[in-house]
Regions:
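Single, function-defining residue in the core of a domain
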Residues: 1-58, 62, 91, 98-102, ...
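Extended Lys/Arg-rich, glycine-bearing segments that form polyanion-binding/interaction patches
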Residues: 110-111
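Major-groove recognition helix of helix-turn-helix-like DNA-binding domains
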Residues: 72-91, 101
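A glycine- and small-aliphatic-rich helix-loop capping segment at beta-alpha/alpha-beta transitions
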Residues: 142
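Short active-site-adjacent helix-start/loop capping segments
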Residues: 52-55, 67-72, 86, 134-135
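A short glycine/small-residue-enriched secondary-structure motif
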Residues: 58-67, 75-82
Length: 392
């Protein structure tokens, strides 16, 4: 099926054309486009992100140099940077947000049976935010401090497959806890989050009352009393497993039910952590291991920023930046889609890290990664000796 196709066209062939057209038609965009459609824009932006282009001029130069191969990648022509800049400024970023929702509905079921590291029946999600810094002089709309600009990307990640289930883009000045109001909470699901999201009023109303669970870290100034304490095996690192009640003036009213606090010492670093949860059933060690899984959302943010080049933007308006982020998320989901439907054994991290080097090759994608790409420990051969893999 993929014989004779470039790696890039194999990935982009997974785009559901009818659904993409529906997203475009919803915002009545293409009727104004002459020689550069929304599909053309998506392909060019995805190619630029996968190959790490750092400016509009760099994109133009790259496409010009590859002009003889563009047709085989599905790209019509070497689009001038001014044309791309105008499209990024004018075309509604919601097109690509809606398309990301379409892709997620197609991709997520493919990962539903993936094994989670912990043997749990519950769905497990990690929720976190990442601040993306912007130049205040170029992006005055993104001001959040006197001399700084930026936006926040609040993301809920399904840890079976590390897929972004929900993404909210806000000003960097927006408090993290307010993003909880946008979440759809699934009964019985477990939500992992850092202590920046500890708002007992919200945790009780949005999660506990909906029969879902949370695991977070207790703040140092939390006021509470111990109701009971369970026996623990301290050789596992668990120091204590306590039932507590909040005693703060407001917190005692906001969250009147008992909570569970598991205190854990990491022997490797000698650091002590206090984990807070409303789950009374799982073993104390499972609670601490669950919180460790929250770092998967950090890996997702690192991937999005480094491997899809969100650290360099191709426009300065709010629309252009939001558009680039959503196309990056769509590209991530297409890679996740390709991994499953093309039966690729390598991790998404390995695929994304290396695929940009081979986009114009005509090797079947699954052959490239299942036979040629080594493991994480031995993949240095893919990079020129002048560079370290950490630079990419």
């Amino acid at each position: 099926m993929n014989k004779g196709k470039t790696i890039f066209s194999q990935i982009m062939s997974l785009i559901p054309e009818r659904d993409f057209k529906t997203c475009v038609d919803r915002y009545k965009v293409n009727y104004r486009a002459r020689n550069f459609s929304c599909k053309d824009q998506f392909l060019v932006m995805s190619y630029a992100q996968l190959t790490g282009r750092d400016s509009l001029r760099d994109i133009e130069n790259c496409l010009t140099a590859l002009s003889s191969k563009l047709y085989h990648c599905g790209i019509s022509y070497a689009v001038p940077r001014n044309t791309l800049a105008k499209a990024n400024e004018k075309r509604d970023w919601h097109i690509y947000k809606d398309f990301a929702d379409v892709l997620l509905k197609k991709v997520r079921p493919l990962y539903a049976k993936d094994k989670f590291r912990l043997d749990l029946d519950n769905m497990v999600y990690a929720f976190d935010s990442s601040t993306i810094s912007l130049c205040l002089k170029l992006c005055p709309w993104a001001k959040f401090r006197k001399n700084k600009g930026g936006i926040k990307m609040h993301t809920l990640v399904d840890l079976r497959g590390n897929l972004p289930v929900s993404v909210y883009l806000t000003s960097a000045s927006v408090n993290d806890v307010k993003a909880l109001d946008n979440l759809y909470i699934e009964p019985s699901a477990i939500y992992l989050m850092d202590r920046g999201y500890v708002d007992f009023n919200r945790l009780f109303k949005l999660i506990t009352k909906k029969n879902a669970f949370f695991v977070t870290r207790a703040k140092d100034n939390m006021l509470f009393e111990v109701v009971s304490e369970a026996e623990v095996d301290k050789s596992t690192g668990i120091i204590s497993d306590e039932r507590i009640k909040l005693t703060g003036l407001h917190t005692a009213k906001w969250y009147s039910e008992e909570l569970r606090m598991v205190t854990y010492e990491d022997y490797a670093t000698n650091k002590v952590y206090r984990f807070l949860t409303n789950n009374m059933e799982y073993e104390a060690l499972t609670i601490s291991e669950l919180y460790r899984e929250r770092w998967n959302v950090e890996l997702y943010f690192k991937w999005i920023k480094q491997h899809l080049h969100i650290k360099s933007f191709y426009g300065t308006s709010e629309n252009a930046i939001y558009l680039q982020i959503w196309i990056a998320i769509c590209t991530y989901l297409l890679l996740a889609y390709a991994k499953k439907v093309m039966h690729i054994d390598q991790s998404l991290h390995t695929i994304s890290k290396n695929v940009g080097l081979f986009l114009t090759d005509k090797t079947p994608l699954n052959d490239l990664f299942n036979k040629a790409v080594p493991t994480e420990e031995t993949e240095d051969w893919l990079y020129p000796s002048l560079f370290s893999p950490d630079d990419f």
